[in-house]
Amino acid sequence: MTSTNALRLRAAIALPVLVGSLFAYSAAFAQSTGTQAAEVQELVVKGQRGPKVVGQVIAESAAKSRSSINQEFIATQIPGQTVLDAINLLPGVNFTNNDAYGSAGGDITLRGFDSQRIALLQDGIPLNDTGNYAIYSNQQLDSELIDRVTVNLGTTDVDSPTAAAAGGTINYVSAKPKQDMGAAITLQGGTENFRRVFARVDTGAVGPFGTTAYLSAAKATNDLFMGPGGIDKMQVNGRVYQELSNGDFMSLMFNYNENRNNFIRRATLAQFNTNTIPVYDSTCVRPSASGVAGGTAQIDISCSNFYRNNINPSNTGNIRGQSSFTLSDKLRATIDPSFQYVLANGGGRTVFKESDAQFRTPTDLNGDGDTLDSVMIYWPNTTNTHRVGVTSSLIYKLSDTSNVRLAYTYDHGIHRQTGEAVPFNAAGDPTNVFGGKDSFGNPIRLSDGTILRRRDRTSIADLNQFAVEYRARYFSDKLLVNAGVRAPYFQRNMTNYCYQRDTFTAYCTTQTPTSVDAAGLVTFAVSAQNTSAANKYGTPRSFTRKYNKVLPNLGLSYEVAENQTLYASYAESISAPRTDDLYDQKLVNPAPETTTAFDIGYRYQTGKVVGAVAIFSNSFENRIVRTFDEENGIFNSRNVGKVELKGVDGQVGWEPLDGLSLYASASYITTELQSNLPNGLNGAIIATKGKELVEIPKLQASIRAEYKIGDFSFGLQGKQVGDRYSNDLNTEKAPAYTLWDANVRYVLPQIGAAKSSLQLNVKNMLDEKYLGDISSGSGSAAGSFQPGYPRAVVLTLRSEF
């Protein structure tokens, strides 16, 4: 049977259940085309008719811990919401959304690992920042275009195109164009002046080859729920899909996203407890330039809390190709090329005297004809990335029950970090949100001809990865063996064009420095950005860092009885040091972080109940943290030892009655640091041995109930998050909280060809007061917190034609 016919068969006899979500595109909850093709072949061999879906739980067959959701469940959430919020009910996942609508950012943890140690992929291509591996939740694909999402808990797939996935992977897959011509539009309105429109047009099958395509666009705006400012987001997407014979296909997709956001001001735990959370200022009055040479000195105030200075603009986009070709009756090739573009910063401002020593000679910053003033300027940290990659596989069918796959991944990212300064205009906005970057704005040029900038450095990251995987069934198909190994070879070529005090503080100047030691460190005269003549800086330099490791993974599953399966998995992963770990005053070379993950799990799958439970243990080696160097008065990156993460998690879906489905998940995670942190000279330490990781809730639980009757559907869901520590010594913690959400949908009577529905969503229905994302404190220092969003109500009208 061809994979195309298999898909048709599954679609024809798919279980009529379901409630949170019926998935009929493919049963391969995988990332790349190669992984998908290998797993589709496995399912055809096994004779499965499509995954069972009960109460949101999708029945998994992989020999590892994995959870998935699909579009039918995603559609019950607020349309346009970030995809990471949609997976928040899954076991082991904790996503803290900065607002109710998904465009203000957020943070995610997975089985005890933070977002910089989790790989996020879109159609198999890596989306993490190429420098610090951060995940930007507000830049993800419009939710209407996501077919399914798969979470590998603590492991990767054998061809995962990443050198930074110690904690697991999250991959979401784009929807295919429809076979019939049509259009869809979504109109939304809600609290905080939320407005959104989404439109999609499908060509249907056109031309002599039956090519299908779609184009979509979305626009969303809302006010911040706390303080002045707002969110403005625009996104455009498209896909062309060409089905060939024998299950072969070619596809080309693109995504472009723009965000223009103001930040919500963070708070301390004390401010939260006393209900005194501050907000950013709505006004800032600064003196105007006199326009007279030799006039009076104007002194700008810093306006550090002015909301228009605290912005987070981003332009991001990618082009993604996918293809699968049958080379013979036993051999298949897949090729997935990609290109990505990122331009973003987090705002910033500073005040310079026009006679500042950093300039060498006085410079007229505000154009008033003199150099007597103190002028506030826009001072961003801008990141610009150009990234190309390809993931490819050759899959050879050894027999009807086994195959072997060879995979190769290449990922090349040019990661440019700059900070070209520009003035503010009369309204208090920067003349360009991206500063003087390239052709966006006019940078401030100093008297010596150089550009005034906050930092200036380049990282060129190259990943070459080879992998092999063997997949087979034995003993009347009861035993599944999945064995593989991947070998990533990762290299960073790094150049810093400025002087560096620590990883966060660069000093870009043409001043003549004073050498102070044999290590090549230098000092400068006091200036606005160099507050002490004793501060030491490393000189501009270029250097290379290389990392490689052979990473095995093994998975076994055995059908011990009808509808019951036991599985076990072992996997090793790596997370190479981030750019922030490498740019420093002195050359540093921390070893890559590594993990060893063990899972033992049980699955029960029938027509009415689908469930899974797993016990896991993860050893996290060579953890990189920034510890204090007392001699130089700065923090350096270094390896500080091991962390043990252990726990149990599970989920169950149950359909007790027609139209009623129930879902529940729970996670219990313990984390323990095995070492103390060095803290300066003479053996001083921060006593972290035996302490828990920050930001990680020990206990989480989720529930959801959904009921469908006639043209109505009703949903209620809750997520409980336990206490989370907010400093290294565990002396401060954010309190536990529970959020309840609800959704109601009514299918309107059809008028002509139009099919419409109204949907009401309520987020944080009980208006819980809580703290979201945590920026943890070092030692016993207090952390800072993102205030949780209040109750939000959204009404959505969907129409398809």
Regions found by a protein language model. Give the residues of each.
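Structural signature of Gram-negative outer-membrane beta-barrels, strongest in the C-terminal barrel
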Residues: T385-R387, I395-G413, A426, G436, ...
